């Protein structure tokens, strides 16, 4: 995937992508549309992009679409006053992973997200009592303040190896793929089988 680190190119490409999405959003009637902003902190650090996201969150549902912001830090959203209110106020579904590192300042997050005491308890319980014999992580999903729960998410060894962000595991996959003539699928299958036989 293309990495946009160039300070001159990034705003130009961003404007092109924004215009393309807005045009499709308005033109395609009855077709579900999604704008997913991964690594949102980069976008939110730009005033123009923050304003664009604010516009999208307020507008996209009128066109049978949804905007999704993915970030590893709640502070990314909290620190952008333009986006904070529009993203949070227009997000019916909130998904949170382990928030233990924010335990000391979770009251601020609770107030910002409008969480009940029950929801706060659910979120702070994530991954606290996982079964050590199973490989899974927990996630909290809240739906519009009406329903919320903690769910275990468990993937196969193949899925785990395909999407891992752990550098050592990625290197292991790529090294084996290189030995197998560049076949990443075969490397993932072999490593997954190796992991299954170890356990």
Regions found by a protein language model. Name each.
Residues 1, 5-27, 123-199:
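Conserved P-loop NTPase motor module
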Residues 2-121, 157:
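Conserved P-loop NTPase motor cores
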